[in-house]
């Protein structure tokens, strides 16, 4: 519980997102989803892992209206849900998640937790460099919504780096939540404003959908990679993808390869294509999955997948979406070595781009993660959640948390987790070096590499059949804390691709 007035890990993780959704406004907010993984030491010194999967419980919930939505969209000739469509908006889960975690483990009142965010929203905060860079790219999206234009553009422009902005509508919304609790977001005037905004755009979400929303506590899933237990969120999250990916790569002697050489990146890319094919075929709401998690995590299955990889050339596989996405990740470890790994996201930058005029709530576009194929496990349907990309992670050794970490970047996240794990386990890197390493991913049939990858590696990938393009903008963003149990030291890492920092308190 911590000393009086001293914030514990979960209190810090409650106060921080409220501030971050303001200062990182283009990537998360009250209309976002939330996911957290926690590790605590019980009084008998036995380690226990708890993963709380909060948010996005009702994806377009409503048995009658949503049940008829899929054929209606198919009749319109739609093959996917557009990211800026009102049909892409799910009931936001973050507010309910914050309240549930605080109620379960917190010692501060909600109004105390929200006070810093309310202060910044009312009195202003400066725009960080990466935030300003990303915000400026969303002018067209923000200009398509009267609410977004009103609350997120300033004289018709994105705020410049270093400028100070205020968000009074969000401050008022937060004050209402601080006063009356999370249900003030899902019932009453705030919910009425949200539903009216969405219904005017054609959404079928109702006041009942918001009122019934509840988060869910789930049990984590894990696999062991050369002595390290990688712990991820279960489906409907894509954490399973990261576990399948490291299982595949365990069949190769990665340690013997140059960490920035073509062999290492070729194997990672080929294994990723296989793992993402598994994701896009199987991962969905657990009740709708036709192949269980245990079977997909079977080491023999991973070995059979590894056998499909040709070390000398690229093997054609189905294309995959761009890394993209906009997310905020943070992790905290307190004095008692309780760790929490938390991620919050609207999915795309500024989500759906749909924003309420009165309350300033920007809506997510998680519904675009559904598949518009009636026979697919991840098909759009009543009371279902779509395949979800946000995945905070924990790495465990001997039942204790070794590293609490995450890598922002939508579809890139499983690859980011894998590269972090390999960098730490196979190449002995500390968390900062593991996060700083240059990255390679793919978009469709194009292999994308960051500028830090050596020219010889690029040529080596091309020689193996990869069509390589250098990506001018970095993707992903890792934050990590390692617990050195022997020396009693915490080691933090925060990479330069984002506006983060490693901070001791």
For each feature predicted by the language model, list its residue ranges.
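His/Glu-rich zincin catalytic helix
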Residues: 2, 17, 24, 29-79, ...
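Active-site rim segments in enzyme catalytic domains, especially the processed small/beta chain
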Residues: 59-72, 76, 204-206, 338-403, ...
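Noncatalytic scaffold domains of N-terminal-nucleophile
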Residues: 78-180, 185-187, 192-237, 297, ...
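Short, well-structured alpha-helical segments that form the helix of a local strand-helix-strand
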Residues: 111-122, 193-195, 211, 259-273, ...
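Short, small/polar residue-rich loop motifs at catalytic or cofactor-binding pockets
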Residues: 217, 324-327, 388-390
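Internal maturation/activation junctions in enzymes
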Residues: 251-346, 358-359, 366, 471-472
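Extended C-terminal subregions enriched in glycine
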Residues: 336, 384, 417, 426-473
